[in-house]
Curated annotation (Swiss-Prot):
EC assignment: 2.7.7.8
One Pfam family, short name: RNase_PH_C
PROSITE patterns recorded: KH_TYPE_1, S1
Reactions catalysed according to its record: RNA(n+1) + phosphate = RNA(n) + a ribonucleoside 5'-diphosphate
Cellular location(s): Cytoplasm
Primary gene name: pnp
Domain of life: Bacteria
Name the record gives this protein: Polyribonucleotide nucleotidyltransferase
InterPro entries the record matches: ExoRNase_PH_dom1, ExoRNase_PH_dom2, ExoRNase_PH_dom2_sf, KH_dom, KH_dom_type_1, KH_dom_type_1_sf, NA-bd_OB-fold, PNPase
Domain S1 motif: residue ranges: 624-692
């Protein structure tokens, strides 16, 4: 059997990308295998032929799955098969989804599913980037209407040089890591993190990415021409102009009045009442068309908000385009948490709590390339009461995972070096109220909770969300957007960073991309807003607290010779267990065989006792050093003195005193404490001690 396989390829930075179709999954609407190096991803798209009756939204589903066989592994779960998506898989789903979602015609409402399955994986060739390109390519060759192509690319920077799709080793040296989705003429999505990079440098990186994908965009168009599948006809949305006119006559002026209400819940209640009354007024003439009527009122809301901002520069809550909402901050309000902050910005409020732990609290993560551990975690929660709603809640959804990761990236850049501050850190952000930009409030509250916990952060960071309203040549960029401005606007651009530069950003576009000039202005306004917020944060906490919470563990680091680690552990872990049971501390021995040991306890005396026990097991007797020992055995020729636990040496009778000693027992007896000096260790490891050499000295003087 032969396959009618078609193939294109193009260079995207460090990756030579090959896209083929016609061999696998031929019953899908569109299917490609996209590869680079040893990484291969099967991307399929399927769109139903007709929309469901009454369908009024676009049901797009994106799934991304990493098969463990792709990395030559067997799943570690009890059932030995892939289960629910990991956090990384969920985040990559969002990367694929966000840039393609705005590129379907408004009238296309058929069920559509994109599935990206990693079937072979190599670390230097990122399957996430290939999946983004593959999703666009599969849509391009299908009959599904799609206004692409788009392509994704990862950008790093090493020694000031921008690199498209850097290798894993290059990323370790890079001071930025962003993923950009772009088309021929515009940017559709940006997401990533940086080490205090300037806005100008970020803008350069974003448009460097746009240039880098032009070859693979052309390759997708060529593949679509080779396949030659015609796009299906999609009828434009049928609008009942008579009904629309009657709805406008009844609702337009009332919506305009409702939009003067600044409080979110009151405004929502007023709009809801208008909808119910208009539906009731038209019920007899237009029976059963409630959803359509409410849709027309939604269109009025959309037009009203946008018109007011573009024509007057005044927003729903009365602000101009550059003003940040009022901010209130309270730190240290949870007495038992290691650090806590209540951050309120307008009608958005986040309670952030920081907890410090040991290496035993690190999160074990499994990937196609092996296991790794996370020392910093940020978990974002969005309960329904934060927007005055009810719902059944189980695990965090894609949105919560995505918002949490964005805030985690923003804060990770300011964390101290782990060798200097060897704690595992977890921040939990509880969204208590939401009216836009709760993820950026999480950055602010999360940073302050670390400072309240006494974590020596490099610099405070804050976050702000920017919006866009664009009608033709008229453009308004909005600082610190509300929920309505996010919903009814054209862009959600979140930027986080310190006074010195950006640490994380995320941009989603609902229109056909944005220009360099718009991004430049948005970044400029974002910096102004960020500096304002940092000033407010400094009024609450200008620097990390000097003392950690009394309830946080204290970690002390000591170093021993690597070949003595076995003495601390003991047979089957017996020795280390006995130390932890005797003192109540937690002991962590670095797995890299460096000899580094962390001892954690909130009780300093217990920590000191554990250190003394470990030192006793691992310290070696040094020539010329004083020891306070215990006489273990008396012999005619001298006394054996234990100077370290399990380690003794001989004090020869001639070394007992400056004068001649006839009997050892004239000077020492078993059980006596005696100060001795090591005067030598022979080749067999036998230790020679002297009481005589230690006379007139003390341990304090020696130290």
């Amino acid at each position: 059997m032969t396959f009618n396989e078609k193939c294109v390829e193009a260079q995207v930075g460090n990756m030579n990308v090959k896209i083929s179709t016609g061999k696998m999954a031929k019953q899908a609407s569109g299917a490609v295998v996209i590869s680079s190096g040893d990484t291969m991803v099967l991307v399929t798209v399927v769109g139903t032929k007709e929309a469901k009756p009454g369908q009024d939204f676009f049901p797009l589903t994106v799934n991304y799955t990493e098969k463990t066989y792709a990395g030559g592994k067997i799943p570690g779960s009890f059932f030995k098969r892939e289960g629910r998506p990991s956090e990384d898989e969920t985040l990559i789903c969002r990367l694929i989804d966000r840039p393609i979602r705005p590129l379907f015609p408004e009238s296309y409402l058929c069920d559509t599913q994109v599935m990206a399955t990693v079937i072979s994986a190599e670390e230097d060739h990122d399957p996430a980037i290939l999946s983004m390109i593959g999703a666009s390519a599969a849509l391009m060759i299908s009959d599904i209407p799609f206004e692409g192509p788009i392509a994704g690319v990862k950008v790093g920077r090493v020694d000031g040089k921008l690199i498209a799709n850097p290798s894993a080793e290059q990323l370790k040296l890079s001071d930025l890591e962003i993923v950009v989705a772009a088309g021929k003429d515009a940017i559709f999505m940006v997401e990533g993190e940086a080490d205090f990079v300037s806005e100008e440098d970020l803008l350069e990186a974003v448009f460097f990415a746009k240039d880098a994908v032009q070859g693979i965009l052309a390759a997708q168009e060529e593949l679509a021409r080779q396949v030659g599948v015609a796009k299906r006809e999609v009828a434009p949305l049928v609008v009942d102009e008579a009904l629309k006119a009657k709805v406008k006559a009844l609702a337009f002026d009332r919506i305009a009045q409702a939009f003067k209400i600044k409080a979110k819940q009151e405004r929502y209640a007023a709009v809801a009442q208008i909808k119910e009354e208009v539906v009731a007024a038209l019920a007899e003439e237009f029976e059963g068309r409630d959803k359509e009527i409410k849709g027309f009122i939604g269109d009025i809301e959309y037009d009203r908000m946008r018109h007011d901002v573009l024509e007057t520069g005044i927003r729903i809550d009365g602000r101009d385009t550059k003003t940040v909402r009022p901010i209130a901050i309270e730190a240290g309000l949870l007495p038992r948490a290691h650090g806590s902050t209540l951050f309120t910005r307008g009608e958005t409020q986040v309670l952030a709590a920081a907890t410090l732990g040991t290496s035993q609290d690190e999160q074990r993560m499994d990937s196609l390339y092996g296991e790794y551990r996370k020392k910093f975690m940020l978990h974002y929660n969005f309960p329904p009461f934060s927007v005055g709603e009810t719902s059944f809640r189980l695990a965090p959804g894609r949105r919560e995972i995505g918002h949490g990761m964005l805030a985690e990236r923003a804060i990770s850049a300011i964390l101290p070096n782990h060798d200097d501050f060897p704690y595992t850190i977890r921040i939990v952000a509880e969204t208590l109220e939401s009216n836009g930009s709760s993820s950026m409030a999480t950055v602010c509250g999360g940073c302050l909770s670390l400072m309240d916990a006494g974590v020596p952060v490099k610099a405070p960071v804050a976050g702000i969300a920017m919006g866009l309203i664009k009608e033709g040549e008229k453009v308004a960029i909005l600082t610190d957007i509300l929920g309505d401005e996010d919903h009814l606007g054209d862009m959600d651009f979140k930027v986080a960073g310190s006074a010195d530069g950006v640490t994380a950003l995320q941009m989603d576009i609902k229109i056909g991309g944005v220009s360099k000039e718009i991004m430049q202005q948005a970044l400029k306004q974002a910096k102004e807003g960020r500096l304002h917020i940092l000033g407010k944060m400094a009024q609450c906490l200008a620097a990390p607290r000097e003392e950690m919470s009394a309830f946080a563990p204290r970690i002390t680091t000591i170093w021993i010779k690597p070949d003595r680690i076995r003495d601390v552990i003991g047979t089957g872990g017996k020795t280390i267990r006995s130390i932890t049971e005797a003192t109540g501390v937690m002991i962590d021995i670095d797995s890299d065989n460096s000899g580094k040991i962390n001892i954690a306890s909130s009780d300093k005396a217990a920590c000191d006792a554990a250190i003394q026990m470990i030192r006793g097991l691992t310290d070696e007797v040094e020539e010329g050093k004083l020891y306070m020992g215990t006489v273990k055995k008396i012999m005619e020729f001298g006394a054996f003195v234990e100077v370290l636990p399990g380690t003794d040496g001989l004090v020869h009778i001639s070394e007992l005193d400056e004068t001649r000693v006839k009997n050892v027992t004239d000077i020492l007896n078993e059980g006596d404490k005696v100060l001795v000096k090591c005067i030598g260790v022979d080749k067999q490891g036998k230790i020679k001690l002297s009481r005589k050499a230690a006379l007139g000295q003390s341990l304090e003087e020696k130290d």
